[in-house]
Amino acid sequence: MKVIITVNYEEMSKKAAEIVKKQIKEKPNTVLGLATGSTPLGMYKHLIEMYKRGEIDFSNVITFNLDEYIGLSPDHPQSYHYFMFHNFFNHINIKKENVHIPNGIAEDLEEECRKYEEEIEKAGGIDLQILGIGINGHIGFNEPDESIETKTHVVTLTEKTINANKRFFKSAEEVPRKAITMGLGSIMKAKKIVLLASGKNKAEAIKETIKGQLTTKVPATVLALHHDVTIIIDKEAASLIPDEDLKEIEVIV
């Protein structure tokens, strides 16, 4: 596990975008695993700028998003379909047929989960998976006490997650109670993983992820078992990492 600490959110975002750019340069038909939420927004902004400067070509890139709310149509402003197209896909030259996001309004949700796993396998697996982290250590919508071997599945969101996401809705009541998410087992199959975190509210989860015991109570601790993980965090998210551990960590200022 490699940990990079940056001075702020902007530098964290830039570093993440550089890693994605390098991956696509090395393999133009890269399969990217993507995340939503406020954390990766800056990375998407930098990737769009790189594309506009002619530094990066997404025409052969394939993407798979981690998750989607159940019950929200793709054109709903709070759906992750809408988020990804509005904030990223509409601004680059990716082919729509190469974009994959779980269908939260599928008639048969179990079949949708099975098909999603099948599509990932058909694409050759995920080359680079981008992750955020919840304040309770969840990755994707894999909540505490999930099995570390799960594939794409339907999950019931915890009150903590609902409260954390209510800022995107008019009220907590409007936040969907269920979602489709790639499982921890699916995520761990990625060839490389980059986890991003910013802000003091993520500091406890980051401390546990980097130095804590492997436990399903903090899903991100499973990343310690992966062979190629880079964690990029700003100083605030790194604020609870013990001083003695900072010696082993790359700090970018």
From Swiss-Prot:
It catalyses: alpha-D-glucosamine 6-phosphate + H2O = beta-D-fructose 6-phosphate + NH4(+). Pfam families: Glucosamine_iso (PF01182). Its EC number is 3.5.99.6. GO terms for cellular component: cytoplasm. CDD domains: GlcN6P_deaminase. Keywords: Carbohydrate metabolism, Hydrolase. Gene3D superfamilies: 3.40.50.1360. One of its GO terms (biological process) is carbohydrate metabolic process. The keyword Hydrolase applies. Pathway: Amino-sugar metabolism; N-acetylneuraminate degradation; D-fructose 6-phosphate from N-acetylneuraminate: step 5/5. The active site is at residues 67, 136, 138, 143. The keyword Hydrolase applies. InterPro entries: Glc/Gal-6P_isomerase, Glucosamine6P_isomerase, Glucosamine6P_isomerase_CS, NagB/RpiA_transferase-like. One of its GO terms (molecular function) is identical protein binding. Catalyzes the reversible isomerization-deamination of glucosamine 6-phosphate (GlcN6P) to form fructose 6-phosphate (Fru6P) and ammonium ion. PANTHER family: GLUCOSAMINE-6-PHOSPHATE ISOMERASE. HAMAP family: GlcN6P_deamin. This is Glucosamine-6-phosphate deaminase. It comes from Thermoanaerobacter sp. (strain X514). The gene is nagB.
